[in-house]
């Protein structure tokens, strides 16, 4: 089954959106496989966002991620990467549809509440970076009510 990496950024944590965000993924039928509440240091943030290191906003992004605790999670389910991106909404909150996390809770692109893997390959890489110890192998008793 497919897995994705989701991170609630410092603004989402500070604004008390952790429960709401987890609830949206659970209500869709996805399974939480790993969760950490963590303060990220600069080298780790730089490693996570290494693919953006040449962008002009890179330093500001890293400063933002290390400014407070984040919630790092692994979610599992059929099509979870693509569907997770739809639940999250567009990177720019002003382009996000109402009903998405960013459409409902974010205004500025630099404070957009949440990160989600953009492809299965990046999810695999991000999960390995954030959860080198692995994830919890379990299945919800609701699994047969969600999947054919």
UniProtKB/Swiss-Prot annotation:
Protein name, entry field: Nucleoside diphosphate kinase 1
Organism: Mesembryanthemum crystallinum (Common ice plant)
Protein family membership: Belongs to the NDK family.
GO BP terms in the entry: CTP biosynthetic process; GTP biosynthetic process; UTP biosynthetic process
SUPFAM superfamilies per record: Nucleoside diphosphate kinase, NDK (SSF54919)
UniProt keyword annotations, A-Z: ATP-binding, Kinase, Magnesium, Metal-binding, Nucleotide metabolism, Nucleotide-binding, Phosphoprotein, Transferase
GO molecular function: ATP binding; metal ion binding; nucleoside diphosphate kinase activity
Keyword Transcription appears in the UniProt entry: no
């Amino acid at each position: 089954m497919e897995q994705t990496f989701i991170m609630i950024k410092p603004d989402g944590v500070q604004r008390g959106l952790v429960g709401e965000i987890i609830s949206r993924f659970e209500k869709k039928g996805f399974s939480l496989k790993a969760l950490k509440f963590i303060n990220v240091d600069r080298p780790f943030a730089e490693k996570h966002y290494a693919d953006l290191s040449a962008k002009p906003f890179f330093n500001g992004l890293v400063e933002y991620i290390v400014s407070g605790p984040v919630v790092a999670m692994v979610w599992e389910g059929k099509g979870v990467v693509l569907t997770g991106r739809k639940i999250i909404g567009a990177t720019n909150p002003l382009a996000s549809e109402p009903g998405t996390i960013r459409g409902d809770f974010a205004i500025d692109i630099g404070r957009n509440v949440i990160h989600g893997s953009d492809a299965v390959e990046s999810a695999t890489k991000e999960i390995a970076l954030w959860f080198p110890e692995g994830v919890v192998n379990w299945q919800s008793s609701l699994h047969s009510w969600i999947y054919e």
